[in-house]
């Protein structure tokens, strides 16, 4: 009788072993099932013998539930066109989110070289409305940086865009021909000049040692955000637009032979590029014909007179100055050439370890470029919060979407209804601050931070400071302070009036450049784009390999399970 019971028990346990082994083998074909099921079975071996059958049954039940959940997800993914559209929409939102992660900041790699030669280059930022819908307000403007090597010459051309330039480094000569009149002026660091659309313009770097670097914005007039260069003098490189006229038109226009025209405008013409090498004698001759640029406010002011030539910004009295920095500004009042374009130009020099006082512009869109120094900027942006809201529905559709959302929010420092976009600033970085958006720039502890700013829609713009002397919050009346801050007006006054400096303040006190290291880490992650995605993919690949190895040894595992159950029965006997 006892032997019969033992035989029955042995048969039951062998059937259970076969069922568990079969279940484990089936699960081996799923992404996470095989190796987890195997671990579950191995844990059961450590249990007392009378608990092991129940443990094995629980392993099987867990795997069955996981398979059903995976099947539901797969069915949802294949549930038809609507589901596919949702998936595509989610992917599109994700791509847009990655693309629009920081729409206001552009490092050197964001610029595209449109001119490249041995003697220099011209780099241009792509149209703002292609970067983000948030930048449509300045879609008519482009940012460009010209670099010309010592003793180089930029051949004459005209464009269908107004050019407003700031000489960030070096010196040279700029010539414009407008209304039949040629004007040549010397330019140097700190000069601001305007080259109108359609005016033939050329320039030369007359220095024998330093590069000439000009930062400029182009105000497009034909197609918003698009501009073209037109080279009259030229040949093969650059190609002269004159060569595109028919031969008969060329001969009639210049009253000369086709051979001579070919030598000037055709394939036998100039082929050294847009920026060419000039001799010392040639640059000296160009300089000899140029008058000294850089007039100041002693020139007749509008409406009594017009500006002639560049405006020497750094030779003027700074509008704000203290031990933490200086701000130099030129607007339509001081430099009449800017009036037509509704643009002001400024230069900020922030002392090492200091920062600009938090502020916002009431009307202007700030387009900024860093020629020298290092630091970081913070821009407070409510639009980023609303964009994040578009992803709310993703949060209920899977853990992976939630993790991506949380990761993005951490990188962009979500605040109380706002996002703070932090950007590391270094030479060649450009950034944009829309009207009304508070921002601050901080210089590193190792060097001053220099920023050139072009402020679009400058007419009647006001800089509103949020800290330091004359900050707008101090001007609230006592009742408004008490109600707004939920504190006593005296305490509010004490905090808001703690800084006496205007415009520039001492920087954060954290030692060791913690903020800069944090920003470098964020940008390193952003440069690698989907680093987290690649790590996840790598984990999946490793799990798959482990799964395959376990699959190859599946038969041995089944035998181990059966052997374990036999040992259990034998021990009981």
UniProtKB/Swiss-Prot annotation:
Segments of skewed composition (Acidic residues): 403-413
CDD domains: cupin_7S_vicilin-like_C (cd02245), cupin_7S_vicilin-like_N (cd02244)
The keyword Cell inner membrane is annotated on this UniProt entry: no
Glycosylation sites: 349
Coiled-coil intervals, chain numbering: none
Taxonomic superkingdom: Eukaryota
Record key words, sorted: Glycoprotein, Seed storage protein, Signal, Storage protein
Signal peptide feature range: 1-18
Cited Pfam families: Cupin_1 (PF00190)
Domain Cupin type-1: 104-262, 311-493
SMART domains: Cupin_1
Residues of the propeptide: 19-86
Basic and acidic residues bias locations: 390-402, 525-542, 549-561
Modification after translation, per record: Three protein-processing steps occur in the formation of the mature protein from the primary translation product.
Span list, region Disordered: 65-102, 288-315, 382-416, 498-573
Single annotated GO MF: nutrient reservoir activity
InterPro entries noted in UniProt: Cupin_1, RmlC-like_jellyroll, RmlC_Cupin_sf, Seed_Storage-Functional
Family according to the record: Belongs to the 7S seed storage protein family.
PANTHER family recorded: 63 KDA GLOBULIN-LIKE PROTEIN, OS03G0336100 PROTEIN-RELATED
Name assigned to this protein: Globulin-1 S allele
Source species of the chain: Zea mays (Maize)
Gene transcribed to yield this protein: GLB1
């Amino acid at each position: 009788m006892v032997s019969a019971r033992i035989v029955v028990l042995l048969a039951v346990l062998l059937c259970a072993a076969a069922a568990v082994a079969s279940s484990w083998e089936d699960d081996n074909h799923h992404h996470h099932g095989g190796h987890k099921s195997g671990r579950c079975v191995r844990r059961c071996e450590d249990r007392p013998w009378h608990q092991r059958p129940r443990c094995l049954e629980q392993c099987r039940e867990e795997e069955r539930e996981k398979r059903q959940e995976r099947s539901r997800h797969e069915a949802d993914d294949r549930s038809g066109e609507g589901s596919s559209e949702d998936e595509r929409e989610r992917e599109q939102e994700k791509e847009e989110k990655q693309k629009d992660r920081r729409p206001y900041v552009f490092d050197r790699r964001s610029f595209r070289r449109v001119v490249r030669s041995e003697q220099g280059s011209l780099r241009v930022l792509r149209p703002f409305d292609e970067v983000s819908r948030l930048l449509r307000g300045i879609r008519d403007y482009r940012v460009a940086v010209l670099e010309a090597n010592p003793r180089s010459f930029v051949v004459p051309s005209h464009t269908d865009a107004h050019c407003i330039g700031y000489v960030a480094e070096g010196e040279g000569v700029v010539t414009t021909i407008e209304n039949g009149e040629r004007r040549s002026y010397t330019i140097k660091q700190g000069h601001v000049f305007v080259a109108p659309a359609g005016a033939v313009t050329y320039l030369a770097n007359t220095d024998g040692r330093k590069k000439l670097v000009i930062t400029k914005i182009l105000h497009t007039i034909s197609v918003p955000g698009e501009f073209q260069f037109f080279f009259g003098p030229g040949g093969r490189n650059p190609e002269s637009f004159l060569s595109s006229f028919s031969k008969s038109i060329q001969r009639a226009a210049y009253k000369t032979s086709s051979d001579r025209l070919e030598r000037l405008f055709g394939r036998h013409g100039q082929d050294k590029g847009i920026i060419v090498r000039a001799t010392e004698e040639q640059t000296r001759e160009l300089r000899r014909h140029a008058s000294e640029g850089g007039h100041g406010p002693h020139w007749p002011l509008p409406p009594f007179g017009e500006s002639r030539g560049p405006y020497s910004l750094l030779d003027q009295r700074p509008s704000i100055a203290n031990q933490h920095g200086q701000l130099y500004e030129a607007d339509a009042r001081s430099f009449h050439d800017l009036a037509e374009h509704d643009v002001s130009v400024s230069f900020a020099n922030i002392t090492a370890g200091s920062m600009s006082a938090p502020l916002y512009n009431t009307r202007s869109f700030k387009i900024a470029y860093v020629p020298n120094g290092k630091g970081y900027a913070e821009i407070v942006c409510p639009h980023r919060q609303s964009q994040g809201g578009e992803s709310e529905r993703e949060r209920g559709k899977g853990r992976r979407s939630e993790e991506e959302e949380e990761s993005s929010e951490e990188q962009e420092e979500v605040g109380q209804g706002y996002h703070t976009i932090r950007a590391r600033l270094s030479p060649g970085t450009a950034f944009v601050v829309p009207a009304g958006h508070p921002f601050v720039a901080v210089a590193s502890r190792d060097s001053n931070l220099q920023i050139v700013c072009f402020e679009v829609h400058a007419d009647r713009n006001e800089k509103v400071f949020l800290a330091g002397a004359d900050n707008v919050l101090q001007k609230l009346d006592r009742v408004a302070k008490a109600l707004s801050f939920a504190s006593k007006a005296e305490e509010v006054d004490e905090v808001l009036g703690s800084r006496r400096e205007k415009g520039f303040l001492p920087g954060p006190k954290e030692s060791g450049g913690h903020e800069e290291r944090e920003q470098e880490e964020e940008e390193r992650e952003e440069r690698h784009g989907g680093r987290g995605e690649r790590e996840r993919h790598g984990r999946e690949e490793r799990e798959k390999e482990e799964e395959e190895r376990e699959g190859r040894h599946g038969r041995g595992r089944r035998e181990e399970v059966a052997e374990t159950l036999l040992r259990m029965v034998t021990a009981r006997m």
